[in-house]
């Protein structure tokens, strides 16, 4: 088991609370180590269910009970309604289910905390990957208060719409999840195009493979590599081209807008 000490500059971040923060593979501390890949960095973040059915998101979308989107606490990563320019992959901590979803709202807690950025707008004394609310709740950052001076009652750094929370990840309670900020990656991307419903993500390049999760309509997904598999007819035509979009995650090109019907990623 590897142990990580979270450092800002030359001082342990946890000195803010008079302790040294340790992060291990078994215990979630201040921030899990980032995993850099062609699809962006991944951080372990505490997620809460957004709810708020009938209300409007920061981009003007009216929330429904089976919506598939996420909220992040900064407008710097807010997609326009109907767009997935900023999208994330959210996975259960045990990696058994993932969803690819657009960022359509701002929150929880803060609105200027782009904690995934190396040049974060707020709480610059915290390391990349650590939400200010998480540091406030767990380590007493800013006196245990958010950037609006409210007492922080949970360490959330992402909100999940009800459909993402329940159908996408199969969660029953707020939980720690792995979040990949897909716009940070260097891989080619494709836009999920459906009639509004979610697209099944499979464990391999055919519909007979087990379902590994969901991809929301408009989500922008990384195209890590391709293979030829089952012929599928979808919103973009008929093809046997499939893309790997994450570890054990595959979708058919029949539901992707990539700008061409040819493969745009290397062979797997």
Predicted regions and their residues:
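Short, low-complexity, Pro/Ser/Thr/Gly-rich segments in the mature regions of secreted, periplasmic
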Residues: 260-268
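SH3/SH3-like beta-barrel superfamily modules
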Residues: 216-260
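SH3/SH3-like (including bacterial SH3b) beta-barrel domains
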Residues: 204-220
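Well-ordered beta-strand positions in beta-sheet-rich domains
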Residues: 98-102, 176, 214, 220, ...
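Secretory targeting and sorting signals
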Residues: 1-36
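Secreted/periplasmic proteins
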Residues: 34-203, 228
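Small disulfide-bonded, cysteine-rich extracellular recognition modules and tandem repeats
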Residues: 4, 24, 106, 204, ...
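Residues that act as N-cap/strand-start positions at coil-to-secondary-structure junctions
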Residues: 82-84, 207-209, 237-239
């Amino acid at each position: 088991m590897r142990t990580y000490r979270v450092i800002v500059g030359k001082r342990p971040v946890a000195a803010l609370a008079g302790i040294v923060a340790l992060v291990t593979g078994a215990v979630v501390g201040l921030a899990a180590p980032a995993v850099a890949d062609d699809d962006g960095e991944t951080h372990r973040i505490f997620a809460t269910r957004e709810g708020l059915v009938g209300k409007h998101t920061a981009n003007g979308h009216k929330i429904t009970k089976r919506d598939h989107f996420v909220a992040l606490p900064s407008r710097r990563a807010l997609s326009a309604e109907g767009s997935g320019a900023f999208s994330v992959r959210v996975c259960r901590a045990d990696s058994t289910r993932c969803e690819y979803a657009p960022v359509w709202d701002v929150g929880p807690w803060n609105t200027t905390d782009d904690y995934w950025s190396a040049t974060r707008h707020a709480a610059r004394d915290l390391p990349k990957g650590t939400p200010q609310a998480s540091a406030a709740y767990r380590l007493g950052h800013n006196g245990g208060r958010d950037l609006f001076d409210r007492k922080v009652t949970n360490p959330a750094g992402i909100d999940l719409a009800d459909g993402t929370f329940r159908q996408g990840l199969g969660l029953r309670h707020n939980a720690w999840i792995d979040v990949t900020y897909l716009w940070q990656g260097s891989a080619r991307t494709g836009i999920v195009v459906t009639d509004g419903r979610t697209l099944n993500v499979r464990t391999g390049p055919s519909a007979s493979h087990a379902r590994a999760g969901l991809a929301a309509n408009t989500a922008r997904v990384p195209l890590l590599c391709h293979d030829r598999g089952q012929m599928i007819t979808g919103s973009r035509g008929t093809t046997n081209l499939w893309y790997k979009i994450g570890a054990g995650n595959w979708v058919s090109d029949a539901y992707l807008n990539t700008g061409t019907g040819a493969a745009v990623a290397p062979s797997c």
